[in-house]
Amino acid sequence: MNYKLTITLTALLGLYGCQQEADQAAATAQAEQNSAQTVTEVAAVTSELVSGIDQSGFDESVRPQDDFFDYVNGAWVKETEMPSDKARWGTFDALGEQSQRDVRTLVEEVSTAEGVEAGTPTQKIRDFYNSYMDAEAATAKGVEAIRSDLEAIAAITNLDGVYSAFSSLGMYGVNTPIGLGIFSDMKDPDVNAIYVVQAGLTLPDRDYYLKDDEQFVKGRQLYLKYVTDVFDLAGFENGSDRAERLLDLETKLAEVMWTKEENRDWSKRYNPMNIDQLNQMAPQINWAVGFESAQIPIDSTFLVSQPSYFEAAGKILSDTPLETWKDYLSFQTISTFAPVLGEQFSELSFNFFDKGLSGVDEQEPRWKRAVDSVNENMGELLGQLYVERHFQAESKARMDTMIQNLIKAYEVSILDLDWMSEETKQQALDKLHKFTPKIGYPDKWIDYTKLEVVDGDLITNIKNGRTFAYNREIDKLDKPVDKTEWGMTPQTVNAYYNPVWNEIVFPASILQPPFFNVLADDAVNYGGIGAVIGHEIGHGFDDSGKRFDGDGVLRDWWTAEDAEKFDVRKNALAAQYDGYDVIDGLTINGQFTSGENIGDLGGLSIAYLAYKMSLDGKEAPVIDGWTGDQRFFLGWAQVWRSKARDEETKRRLTVDPHSPPKFRANGAAVNVPAFYEAFDVKEGDGMYLPPEERVKIW
């Protein structure tokens, strides 16, 4: 039973898909130079332009009426070299890289500190970072660093030992078939609840095990090689035979898992059970043993996300030979720690997760992985340092004003909807007025006093960090929900909506150009951060978020007729995205990406309305030859400036609920009438949709 701090468990709906979480080894100096140069270019996009529009990326050979993304970003896409240690590169990634470098500066300032008192933040950051940077020590220890864990697995004599290991290893983030998480009860958000969810796959999605498309067949081949190589390097015999058995086991698990589309329905995923009901659902699983090892009281109520999975998984668990489960646990444990077990194991991990599945050419330099690991284990300690140096107080004040303007615009739009009844409108407005914004950084920081960091022992530090995070969650079980907590650190370039707390959250790092520029006029800011704000508010009213009310309670507040009308519009938008050919005949999954597409369309539409309201009837100035409306849409399109390796694009089409950036830019714009007026889009143009085919939801 593994505990993971995941967006899936906590129902956080982020603006941008996170990069694959995998530690990688050293990259070349050229990669760093390329990254730094591009970061500088992107960070300076608007600093010298009153309009806030970076025209250097424009492709003048493309008409904005035919392909708006390519017009705004085409030259940048053609001329920008992909950093060798990246699967994708664009606005988000460049700002993320800059944030990473800013954090590195902060970390390295304390990494040489002397005479530091034990237990202080400086000591913890210094010793954790330095232990990671000691590559020679990691290579010298190799798999021996986790030998005690492997010996404990080898000593297991029955399935009860397997269930116990699911929990004890799960505390360290080891992947197992039973996932546990602690978060607000979706029907009683002030109470913490225990969620039980399907888990346990190594490949990115069940499709990789069950479908025969080229990328999935290749994925299975990569899996077999990776598992074989891991076993061989760790000193196990017959690695290829073990790999075949594990692929068979994970395929059986994949067959009974819910699809990503099914997992979007939170009402079906809310299934409260006590221990007796769990035993009745899956009698083959010794739930009590697992929960005891996980330090969870067995008299708790458990919210089971996918009951049919556990019914079938119980049979798989009991029918699978014990030795296969021990191999599974051994492999998953080694794979979890492989990036920090020395050069050879790190290379195996990189070759599978990054090079094989995402097409990355070279491993990241060790300092990047070290910074990421410190961020993972004590992110809010670094966050405090980051905010002190890099966040401007005036940004918070201006963001708060924009958020209130977006909420006012949503109110106007909801009242004006011609397809929604007054009854549902009032419920929607009640929810809208209960949104809680969080901007920049937490009011209350995590207390890391109980986190022990030792000098020169990387594996112990990582285990301590993950155990600390696990214990913080367990401690919540007998306490009220603390809604001051954040799901992202201030140094994260992203934003999110949490439906159970009905909050929209904007970390400090996203409040910079091209999203938010204090030097630019309002048009580009409403097209950038304004649309981001609108996007996150829109998640409260997408096909998933609309199931929660203003207090974060999972309940149906829609009339049946209004719900049906919403679905008609949602399905029409999904059909549009289904028709976008992305790469090699592969298209977007419109239903899977539905929530993000609704967020984009609502965000852009409402941000435009808020921008027009901010003008208070005045005419916007023409700046750099662009009208205010044109600058608004140009600001929107330049936010999505991005490119990706083919393998990464294909992977994301399978696992990422966000559409590819180009289709986020174009897909929303073609449904907004003001875009047609701003750029004189007419029938026959590539960006033209007949009025009757344009979708308006909010």
Which residues fall in each region the model found?
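Bacterial N-terminal signal peptides that target proteins for export
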Residues: M1-T6
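C-terminal motif of bacterial Sec signal peptides marking the signal peptidase cleavage site
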Residues: G14-G17
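Bacterial signal peptide processing site
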Residues: Q19-E21
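Post-signal peptide N-terminal segment of mature Sec-exported envelope proteins
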Residues: A25-E48
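Intrinsically disordered, low-complexity linker/terminal regions across diverse proteins
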Residues: V42, T46, K252, M281-I285, ...
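Hydrophobic/aromatic-rich, well-ordered segments within soluble, folded domains that form packed cores
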Residues: F58-K78, Y209, D213-D232, S594, ...
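Noncatalytic, helix-rich "gating/capping" subdomain that lines the substrate-entry/channel surface
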Residues: V110-T401, N405
